[in-house]
Amino acid sequence: MIPQIQRNVIRQRVHTRIRERIQGTTERPRLNVYRSLNHIYAQIIDDTQGRTLVSASTIADKIKTGGNVAAAKEIGKLVAQRAVDKGIKKVVYDRGGYLYHGRIKALADAAREAGLEF
């Protein structure tokens, strides 16, 4: 079994490799996801200007439990609704070095259902 500290270092290395290839632009900003044990965070970032355009998390919103798949679906819908309201329809999905499974996949599927294309 890999200790949690080493697992996080491995994830950060994978995320660095992903970020070398993925770049958010003004036309297609980057949908970044961060997952902790108790919460999930999503933000849409324009890397050319270095600005966060839209964000949503289980801390800022009134979702009682933040560390489960249902909360990830809610955050996916919420960030997609906020993005569509600002005129953003196409994004690049940045899974943040996490496996595309569980909460990360649920957030992506909910964002797609709510109108984002990636």
Swiss-Prot record:
Pfam families the record matches: Ribosomal_L18p
Record has rRNA-binding as a keyword: yes
Any single GO BP term: translation
A GO molecular-function descriptor: structural constituent of ribosome
Source taxon at top rank: Bacteria
Cellular component annotations (GO), alphabetically ordered: cytosolic large ribosomal subunit
CDD domains reported for this sequence: Ribosomal_L18_L5e (cd00432)
Matches recorded under InterPro entries: Ribosomal_uL18_bac-type (IPR004389), Ribosomal_uL18_bac/euk (IPR005484)
The keyword Glycosyltransferase is annotated on this UniProt entry: no
Key words, A-Z: Ribonucleoprotein, Ribosomal protein, RNA-binding, rRNA-binding
SUPFAM superfamilies (UniProt xref): Translational machinery components
Family (UniProt): Belongs to the universal ribosomal protein uL18 family.
Function: This is one of the proteins that bind and probably mediate the attachment of the 5S RNA into the large ribosomal subunit, where it forms part of the central protuberance.
Quaternary context: Part of the 50S ribosomal subunit; part of the 5S rRNA/L5/L18/L25 subcomplex. Contacts the 5S and 23S rRNAs.
PANTHER family: 39S RIBOSOMAL PROTEIN L18, MITOCHONDRIAL (PTHR12899), LARGE RIBOSOMAL SUBUNIT PROTEIN UL18M (PTHR12899:SF3)
Name of protein: Large ribosomal subunit protein uL18
Gene that this polypeptide is encoded by: rplR
